[in-house]
Amino acid sequence: MADNDILNKFKEDQEETTIDTSKKLKVGIIGTGWIADAHIQQFKKMPDVEIVCGADLIDGKAEKFFEKHGVENVRCYHNHKELIDNEELDAVSVCTYNRTHAECTIYALEHGVNVILEKPMCVTIEEAVDICKAEKKSGKVLSIGFQPRFDENMKMVKKIVESGQLGKVYYIQTGGGRRRGIPTPFGTTFIENETAGIGALADIGCYSLDMVLNAVGYPKPLTVSGYVSDYFGKDPNYCDYVQKGHPEYASLFGVDDFGAGFIRLEGGIILDFRIAWAMNLDTPGDTIIMGTKGSLRIPSTECWNGSIGGPMKIYHEVAGEQVETEIPVITDQGENNFYKKMRSFLDAVKTGGKAPVPTSQIIINQAIIDGIVRSSKLGKEVEISIPEI
């Protein structure tokens, strides 16, 4: 089969969605840090969205945020409770630091507000369960902020697996990382345990996990043998700290900068995963999905950006011959993935549809991360159990 035939077979039609602009959705933004910049930039493109309020714990920060983005007549509050108690909203973006994700999301759902929650879903599996229970009770739309889901190349991965071209998938290798990339340009909220709770595992590792788990239908995890470390983050001589003039960050570092896990999934699938904020390596390797009929190699990815390092390849047999079929990178994708993430959430709010990135899947992602941390602390393999919601 020719390369173009493979591409045409799997490429999804990219049709423009007609948006009903007759009713405007009133939205608020909780937390006005750097990720909120991405949210408001997409909201401003949508004619059916009215940004009416925002909240931030730091005095004056919300006001400066909206001024920077040229959004006027916006009411600003000091915390999520004040905002939700005083506004009639259709939806909120939760863009706060990890430790407050559960609290803000649950409060919004309990007060009848739809939520798009930035990843990670939360810090612990217990918090994830509480969020899912609140969502179920509220009947509102709660979608988790995984914009790579909307990248056409990431969609292609799922389509290839679902097509049966690979046969039964039995082994997956995935991960990613940065040679030097502990996220400190935004201050210390990403690296302090009191605010972040988890480091590289939840910040960028969740994207790698989602890419492959979504492709194979999010099977439940059974056990994990995990390992985490913080060698770079706690080193005051770490070059990024020194170059940016903040060697004191090392004393504040309280999360992981590397994590790895060997996970057994339902259906006889093994998942070999590793992620790093910092390492003495250019990449921990390609993503590989191995099956009984074929295997898929995805060049080293930056899943958090929804990007892959080059054309994918399927290794399979054709007419008794071993062949490699190259899948070109899809570059023409229309609007950016972040816009698609926000738009799909709001469309679900308008229609009463299902969340585009549902908690029923992301709780599995969260359970694996939780299991890796537990296993590393105990120094042995642990079972993963996800309670019924």
Predicted regions and their residues:
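Conserved SAM-binding strand-loop segment of SAM-dependent methyltransferases
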Residues: N73-H80
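C-terminal capping/lid region of NAD(P)-dependent oxidoreductase domains
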Residues: S22, K140, G167-Y171, I191, ...
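Predominantly a Rossmann-like dinucleotide-binding segment in NAD(P)-dependent oxidoreductases
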Residues: P148-S251, G379
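Hydrophobic residues in well-ordered beta-strands that form the structural core
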Residues: H78, L117, L142-I144, Q173, ...
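Beta-strand-loop-alpha-helix segment that lines the small-molecule cofactor/substrate pocket
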Residues: A2, I84-N86, A91, Y97-N98, ...
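Glycine- and charged-residue-rich phosphate/anionic-cofactor binding loop of Rossmann-like
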Residues: E50-C53, T325-I330, D347-N365
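N-terminal Rossmann-like dinucleotide-binding module
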Residues: A2-G70
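Contiguous beta-strand/loop segments that form the cofactor/metal-binding neighborhood of enzyme cores
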Residues: A2-T21, D210-S307, K340-K354, D370-G371, ...
